[in-house]
Design a protein with these regions (language model features):
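Short coil/linker segments at helix-helix boundaries
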Residues: 1-64, 70-122, 129
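Terminal, low-structured helical/coil segments at or just beyond the last alpha-helical repeat
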Residues: 114-117, 126-166
Length: 166
């Protein structure tokens, strides 16, 4: 809550700041996913829309901003793959193919190690969900090089196909 308030203040002071808009969107998405996905609470409508709009604004200002592209791709993916059609329509629609394409583009190496890792983890997760095991294994091997102590990645690479997501 405090982080979202700080992000809102930053956006109020600098409404054309793509980074502040990204953080507002990302923090709202984290809240929605915690409430809905982890806790099972059916709440977060306003936070979802604030996230979607602020990420869209961030990308309008900085179309190549990798972290905003990744967060927005997650919205497209989850709305298209996890929501019933009517709910997906109410949430503004999603696009799984676009989400996978954007995540794949974002998961190319770059100067920003953190943004690259975030995109690569996202791509790996989507590949597992899509049962693209060969692609997921390639992504996991790259992640294992970056994070050799990550037990989930190590298990996936060792198994060759399975993940704790299954």
């Amino acid at each position: 809550t405090r982080g979202r308030a700080m992000a809102r203040e930053a956006v109020a002071k600098h409404p054309k700041d793509a980074v502040a808009l990204f953080y507002l969107g990302k923090l709202n998405l984290n809240y929605v996913w915690l409430e809905l996905g982890t806790l099972g609470h059916r709440t977060g409508w306003n936070e979802y829309w604030e996230a979607r709009h602020s990420l869209d604004e961030s990308l309008a200002l900085a179309p190549t901003y990798r972290r905003a592209r990744v967060a927005r791709a997650w919205i497209d993916y989850i709305v298209d793959t996890r929501m019933p059609w009517g709910t997906g329509w109410l949430l503004g629609g999603g696009n799984k193919k676009k989400a996978l394409r954007v995540m794949n583009e974002a998961a190319t190496s770059g100067a920003d190690r953190y943004a690259y890792a975030e995109a690569l983890f996202g791509l790996w997760d989507m590949q597992i969900r899509e049962k693209r095991t060969a692609d997921a294994l390639k992504s996991a091997r790259l992640l294992a090089e970056m994070f050799p102590n990550n037990p989930e990645v190590a298990r996936f690479v060792a198994s060759g196909t399975r993940s704790t997501h299954d």
